[in-house]
Amino acid sequence: MLVVDDQCCVRNAASADTNRRALPRHEPGQATAAVAMTLNPLTEKPVVACFTPGTKIATGRGETLVEHLVAGDRVVTRDNGIQTVRWVGQKKIDWRIMTTNPHLKPILVRRGSLGNDLPERDLMLSPNHRVLVTNERTALQFDEPEVLVAAKHLIGGVSVRSIDSIGTTYLHFMFDRHEVVLSDGIWSESFHPTDTSLKGFGNSQRSEIFEIFPDLETADGRASYRAARTTLTKDQASQLVD
């Protein structure tokens, strides 16, 4: 069994090691109203990292269903305390799209399958959604105490597997920086805007994101929005999955 978190605790922002990575902060603009939109489902094969309805996200006022989050909500993050959601989006995938595009099938993570009784309930994620893994093996094998691993690279047995679905809605949200948030008891990522992930959006949707985050229109701006942790490849992740 892969144990995603040996410590199994929520780290307080005051004790976070904020010096280990100096992430540039995008200055908040005035466009903080909710932006909920249906995204392009089939522009590129890579799947945008997303949650699914029913996932509970830890916020400043307790757990909130991800589908109820709106821009302006305050969410608990691992590194930077409680942060404000700047953007939310959704991608609806019906059964026809799912049938002809198996790479879009959600990954089911069974309750307790990741060690320490985590996640707290059955959790479904998009294949590319990255989960935080922090245990002795990550430190020994990769010289990193904490790493991110795509859900599709955690597949093993019946506990973590790709499932057939008649359709789903993929939901995601974004902060001023890439954050790690608490979802059904496990730490996983917020939306990370990269060249690849932004290709999953139509022109109008990208324009709305760029209105909130104008720096992301340039390659340098996207590069400055760095990932919160190192991401393991499929081969690297296989070393952690029994």
Report residues per predicted region.
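A sequence-level detector of short linear motifs
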Residues: L65-V66, T84
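Sequence-level preference for short, compositionally simple segments enriched
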Residues: M1-F51, T59, T64, I163-D242
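Long beta-strand-rich cores associated with HINT superfamily self-processing modules
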Residues: T52-T59, V76-Q205
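Structural motif
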Residues: E67-R74
